[in-house]
From Swiss-Prot:
ATP binds at residues 181-188. Residues 1-83 are periplasmic. Acts as a processive, ATP-dependent zinc metallopeptidase for both cytoplasmic and membrane proteins. Plays a role in the quality control of integral membrane proteins. In the central section; belongs to the AAA ATPase family. It comes from the Bacteria. GO terms for cellular component: plasma membrane. It comes from Treponema pallidum (strain Nichols). This is ATP-dependent zinc metalloprotease FtsH. Its cofactor is Zn(2+). It is found in: Cell inner membrane. Coiled coil: none annotated. It is an enzyme of class 3 (hydrolase). Keywords: ATP-binding, Cell inner membrane, Cell membrane, Hydrolase, Membrane, Metal-binding, Metalloprotease, Nucleotide-binding, Protease, Transmembrane, Transmembrane helix, Zinc.
């Protein structure tokens, strides 16, 4: 068989060489007529099978068939060979594609609904993170700064370990303990410590995990959670962010049928607790004021344990725990760090230690020094240093006098916090400089004198600008806003005005956060008085601060000039300047002599050859 082009194939048909054609798809086979072939005995006729054949690939058309008829060529059309396997696959392939696409989306939807399995029928299963007995490694020794809360929870641990001691005498352990406190204070850590100390299974779930798109899922998950816990009792169920499902049902505006069904099921399950099973429910929230009263009644959450921000002693203990895994230099004073981190939670302090370790690595040191911790505190409190920010010299002078005014007012105003640091290095998004004040001790109440002293310190930045330059700038915008808020609260919240003495003009919530309510319960005349009284007090305090800084103008100019040269003045240097207030010239001479003495050895060294 010889393969030829289709055009040549047609030419051989036209010449009469091809006398028979078999039409396939898409090929053509042409057979020639049998003709004699030479042999040893002469000529012999070739059979049709032995006759030359031609093979071509082309397209069957009406003109080609007409040509075959005209040439009286015998032709036949060979039926197409059918491959049943391929045909079956061609029919089934689209169906298989649709099936796999449907299965993919069905599994994804079922997974989103249930969070556990690939079946939509598992949507009602609880999405709790169960930790087996003995696998919770957290202990009370890992928790610091909340000693009172630990004492309350130690009783829960004792019940889980020795339940008969309580049941034999007829006592009942609280069925539920609600941990209340601001974010980051260690509520979840305390719950894990209880489970770790008692060596019992620990079931942890978030309040938002109960609510999904299908009605009834929340109640089903509550039932499943308590069923799992009872099977492994004694144990602890911990619900984080309880306010997600426990909001009060009294507010019809924010009512939600699915959330109410979930809450009702939770109340039923808590009523069904058996005091002898050793199953205790712990929950945490930072919004106890929005919880439903039925949830807080005795027999459900019997105890509310306040987990507040730590005091000075607690902050030091927390820092020591987090510093156990960090290489600290011997001279690091964690108590000093605790003193400047007033109001920090346990999570904030952990972040400070971690940031200090990262700063030490960035600087190429093998240990964390005190400077790293100070920088970490300022970074978490104010923001990152912006050393690359370009500030005009005129603006730097305004900032220097502004911050010096804050520092002097904080020093010479009775009741103000002491100055820890002054700097004109920008930080964060808006701080072009700042004066770091720290209280001597933690405060739980604030006197009227201390509030007015804080107002004086806030207004002293603008007052310093006025004393130094005779005009003010927008740099004191945030200070004025904060001072206005303090004075307004003194009048409306604390009853510290002459006309409305001992009268609170605003209502506050009754919960832990005591959020102010938006409703105003006083007249327009009272509002006018409040506005006028705020303006009067601020004007009076501003005049007093201007008088103070005018009296201390020489000291103001000296510290501001020093601040422009060095950019940062620490507490020790600032206090030395204050002590030498009446001998600034002598202080200048001593400082210049110290600088000359420090530079003399460097000048006496011979240059390297």
């Amino acid at each position: 068989m010889r393969i030829i082009p289709f055009s040549e194939f047609k030419d051989r048909i036209a010449s009469g060489e091809i006398v028979k054609v078999v039409v396939g798809s898409p090929y053509f086979v042409g057979y020639t007529s049998a003709r004699p072939a030479p042999s040893a005995r002469g000529f012999s006729l070739l059979s049709e099978r032995e006759a030359p054949t031609y093979h071509a690939i082309g397209v069957l058309s009406d003109s080609f068939l007409s040509m075959l008829d005209e040439r009286q060529v015998v032709y036949s059309i060979k039926p197409r060979e059918r491959n049943y396997l391929i045909e079956t696959f061609q029919y089934l392939f689209p169906l298989l594609i649709l099936f796999f696409v449907w299965r993919f989306f069905f599994k994804r939807m079922a997974s989103n609904v249930s969070g556990l399995g690939s079946s939509i029928f598992s949507a009602g299963h609880a999405r709790s993170a169960a930790v087996e007995e003995g696998k919770v490694t957290t202990r009370f020794a890992d928790v610091a700064g909340v000693d009172e809360a630990k004492e309350e929870l130690m009783e829960v641990v004792d019940f889980l370990k020795f339940p008969k001691k309580y049941t034999e005498i007829g006592g009942k352990i609280p069925r539920g303990v609600l941990l209340v406190g601001p974010p980051g204070t260690g509520k979840t850590l305390l719950a894990r410590a209880v489970a770790g100390e008692a060596s019992v299974p620990f079931f942890r779930i978030s309040g938002s995990d109960f609510i999904e798109m299908f009605v009834g899922i929340g109640a089903s998950r509550v039932r499943d959670l308590f069923k799992q816990a009872r099977e492994k009792a004694p144990g602890i169920i911990f619900i984080d962010e309880l306010d997600a499902i426990g909001k009060s049902r009294l507010n019809a505006i924010h009512s939600n049928d699915e959330r109410e069904q979930t809450l009702n099921q939770l109340l039923v399950e808590m009523d069904g607790f058996d005091n002898t099973t050793g199953l205790i429910l712990l929950a945490a929230t930072n919004r106890p004021d929005v919880l439903d009263p039925a949830l807080l009644r005795p027999g459900r959450f019997d105890r509310q344990v306040c987990v507040d921000r730590p005091d000075l002693k607690g902050r030091e203990a927390i820092l020591r725990i987090h510093a156990q895994n960090v290489k600290l230099a011997p001279e690091v004073d964690l108590k000093a760090v605790a003193r400047i981190t007033g109001g920090y939670s346990g999570a904030d302090l952990a972040n400070v230690v971690n940031e200090a370790a990262l700063l030490a690595v960035r600087s190429g040191r093998a240990q964390v020094i005190e400077t790293d911790l100070d920088e970490a505190v300022e970074k978490t409190m104010i923001g990152l240093q912006k050393k690359s920010r370009v500030i005009r010299e005129e603006e730097r002078r305004i900032i220097a006098y502004h911050e010096t005014g804050h520092a002097l007012a904080g020093t010479f105003t009775k009741g103000a916090d002491k100055v820890h640091k002054i700097t004109i290095i920008p930080r964060g998004t808006s701080a072009l400089g700042y004066t770091f004040h720290i209280p001597e001790d933690d405060r739980h109440i604030v006197t009227e004198q201390q509030l007015l002293a804080e107002v004086d310190v806030l207004l002293s930045g603008r007052a310093a600008e006025f004393v130094a330059f005779g005009e003010v700038s927008t740099g004191a915008g945030n200070d004025i806003s904060r001072a206005t808020d303090i004075v307004r609260k003194m009048i409306t919240d604390y009853g510290m005005s002459e006309k409305f003495q001992n009268v609170a003009l605003t209502r506050r919530g009754t919960g832990y956060l005591a959020e102010p309510q938006l409703a105003r319960e006083y007249s327009e005349c009272t509002q006018q008085y409040v506005d006028e009284e705020v303006a009067r007090v601020l004007a009076e305090r501003y005049r007093a601060v201007v008088a103070l800084l005018t009296e201390k103008k020489e000291l103001l100019e000296y510290i501001a000039t020093r601040l422009l040269e060095r950019e940062t003045i620490e507490r020790d240097e600032f206090e030395e300047v204050i002590r030498c207030e009446h001998d600034l010239e002598g202080l200048k001479k001593r400082l210049s002599q110290q600088q000359e003495g420090a530079s003399a050895p460097a000048q006496g060294q011979s240059p390297p050859s």
